[in-house]
Regions:
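Short connector loops/turns at beta-strand edges and beta->alpha or beta->beta junctions
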Residues: 14, 103-107, 163, 222
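Internal, conserved structured core segments that host functional sites
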Residues: 85-138, 159
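Non-membrane alpha-helical structural segments and their capping/turn regions in soluble enzymes
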Residues: 24-27, 31, 121-124, 273
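N-terminal Rossmann-like or analogous alpha/beta NTP/dinucleotide-binding catalytic cores
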Residues: 1-104, 259, 263
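Short helix-capping/linker segments at secondary-structure and domain boundaries
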Residues: 5-6, 71-75, 108-115, 221-230, ...
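Short, histidine-centered active-site or binding-site loop motifs used for metal coordination
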Residues: 13-15, 112-113, 171
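Conserved nucleotide- and phosphate/pyrophosphate-binding catalytic cores
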Residues: 122, 128-302
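Short, flexible turn/loop "capping" segments at secondary-structure junctions
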Residues: 9, 106, 167-170
Length: 302
């Protein structure tokens, strides 16, 4: 993608503030995610890779877009409803306006295509709403309508280990396999994955938790391995313990080369600093161009 498009990738440390992270943990997480991006192949020479909080223009656009975002539409966000249910004691304004900040992340660079998972498509639709609303109110065409760039049928939502939802840092430590997890950590997490007592009817539909395990296996295991356990499930002889042991070893083999690269990259402070500085400069140029147009349209001095 980075060789075919003018790509922007960022580390979303503003977004993480809704969970009130410890400052030292936040700093370490930013460094780790940057190393992970680089280890997975992002090239700071080919794309713009930056830290969200290094771009105050995003915060300004977030503020300006909030002036035309309505409480009712924000409360209808599926993600907001989920968070209210999951953490009723921490329903803060940042959670409510999360889609507006996501819109600012996208619109600050006037992005045309956004790599987005299916669970975030509602937020992309809200981004189009906010951008179009701004254009209409101020009689301008500053913001394009961004569309999903999701590789079509090749798109796979990586499921979590808890039996439902997606795999992600925000969903809980035990729900996700991190690229830098040690082999013993991966084994423990996978062996704790949710299962049931097993099928009793041949070729029965798989419950969500079981389908999740098969989806994970389809990502990291050989086709023959997947087929073996598919057949075992369909003829009701499957042993989930054996399946999870195999899945854990295949995950370890899949993540090990990346984990080694992450470790080496984290040790190279000069490389990390250079990547952040390069990305910050390129992101500032793009964001400043957008904000000039936005401020002029609103009537602010530029």
């Amino acid at each position: 993608m980075q060789y075919e498009y003018h790509c922007f990738f960022f580390i979303a440390d503003y977004h993480s503030l809704t969970t009130h992270p410890n400052p030292e943990n936040l700093k370490g997480n930013v460094r780790t995610v940057l190393a992970e991006y680089l280890a997975c192949g992002l090239d700071p020479e080919k794309c713009t890779l930056y830290v969200q909080s290094d771009l105050p223009q995003t915060a300004e656009l977030y503020l300006l877009l909030n002036m035309h975002a309505y409480v009712g539409e924000l409360e209808r966000s599926t993600t907001f409803k989920d968070k209210v249910r999951q953490q009723p004691d921490n329903v803060n304004a940042g959670l409510l306006t999360y889609p507006v900040l996501m819109a600012a992340d996208i619109l600050i660079h006037r992005a045309a295509k956004v790599p987005v998972g299916k669970d975030q498509e509602q937020h992309l639709e809200m981004t189009r709403t906010f951008g179009n609303r701004f254009n209409r109110i101020y009689k301008t065409d500053i913001f394009p309508e961004p569309v999903a760039f999701n590789f079509g049928k090749q798109l796979v939502k990586v499921p979590g280990l808890d039996g439902s939802g997606k795999m992600g840092k925000s969903e809980g430590e035990g729900n996700a396999i991190f690229l830098s997890d040690a082999p013993e950590v991966i084994r423990k997490k996978v062996m704790r994955a949710v299962t049931d007592s097993g099928p009793t009817i041949p070729n029965a539909p798989k419950p969500e938790a079981i389908q999740n395990l098969f989806t994970l296996m389809s990502i990291v295991s050989k086709p023959d391995t997947v087929n073996y356990f598919e057949e075992s499930y369909n003829n009701c002889t499957i042993r989930y313990g054996d399946m999870k042991k195999q899945l854990a070893e295949d995950m370890i083999a899949f993540t090990a080369p990346i984990a080694e690269k992450i470790k080496a990259t984290l040790a190279d402070t000069a490389l990390l600093q250079k990547a952040m500085a390069m990305g910050k400069e390129k992101a500032h140029y793009s964001a400043n161009e957008t904000l000039k147009l936005v401020r002029s349209a609103i009537g602010f001095s530029v």
